[in-house]
Amino acid sequence: MKKILQIPNYMYPHIGGIEQVARDIADSLIGREDIEQKIICFNGDAADGDYVCHQKETVTDKVDGVDVVRCGCFTKIASQSLSMTYPKQLKKIINEFQPDIVIFHYPNPFVGEFLQHYFKKNFKLVVYWHLDITKQKILGKLFHGQTIRLLNRADRVVATSPNYIEGSPYLSQFRNKCIVIPNCIRTERLQPNETVLKKVQQLKEKYKDKTLCFGMGRHVPYKGYTYLIKASKLLDDNFVICIAGKGPLTDSLKEEAKDDPKVEFLGRVSDEDMIAYYMVCDIFCFPSITKNEAFGIALAEGMYFEKPAVTFTIPGSGVNYVNIAEETGIECPNGDVSAYAKALESLSKGKALREKYGKNAKKRVEENFMFDQLGEKVKELIDGL
């Protein structure tokens, strides 16, 4: 029996890339009689139907049958949650659960500091590297030593793309420990129902004779929506640019696009509306510009629906590993709005090119970024430790 402890930042119903990967890993191991799992994370205000979490509470519950210890938080500094109960709960789990394998999702410097206290314990350490700390430069410098100690102690380091290994100043020093496990999409949540199909017909009617470009994500700087809006201003009225999501930049983005009737802001969309837009759009726009975008699940989902993608070159990011230039879509020089607009124009005018890239895009996702493939790689990782 192998006991596995995962340490993500948060856990479902909190929505985020790291949280989804942690859930994917846990789900991939469910049903194995030789494995027992536990998860420790911060608590956060989040809900999904009757499943409600409160930031300040320290509780234990279950997600998909796996025990989750959620530690109440009193504040957040530089995107890092702080908790008074976390050290005690981590100590209890390490001493009582006695994990054979600890999967630590990086970055999480507050927890990394406490985890170091148990480095002499007899567990295998997997550092699951989601992204470099690039935005919070002071935080990155402050925890530089901790990061090196984590990587030195690690038995394996998981990156989500080979691009990130080569582009990270940390991972490139520890290539011999690194393996690649790409993130995955969950196709069960992407299946159209009657409501979706009805919405599809409505959208087709609304946007007939238009080239529909769809983008979806949080409205934050690294997502690059300002560049998509600037590119839209260079396009003719045959285009419509639909942007789903919300965030700190929503108001400023709307202000920037106020004189451009081609741009429509959809706000937060339901899964059903999201699927409908995936199905109806002609081009999937993913204008992220920095390594904070380490992979791009929404990008992979759009490609799964046979949509050619238009991305920017991001050195060291997995975005350009997901979308292959001139094979599954078009890659533009970083921040070059003129090139981005020309890419959209070429795909709009070239139906054969759109279809070629779209078919290749779906094939790439099916061959590389599916849940079963992640499960196999996680199994290889666990069994090899």
Where are these regions (language model features)?
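N-terminal subdomain of nucleotide-sugar transferases
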Residues: 1-55, 64, 152
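Conserved donor-binding/catalytic core segment of Leloir-type glycosyltransferases
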Residues: 5, 197, 203-223, 229-233
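Short alpha-helical donor nucleotide-sugar binding micro-motif in glycosyltransferases
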Residues: 151, 268-269, 276-281, 303
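A short, active-site helix/loop in glycosyltransferases that binds the activated sugar's phosphate group
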Residues: 152-192
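Nucleotide-activated donor-binding/catalytic signature segment of Leloir-type glycosyltransferases, i.e.
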Residues: 251-272
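Acidic donor-binding loop of glycosyltransferase active sites
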Residues: 279-294, 307
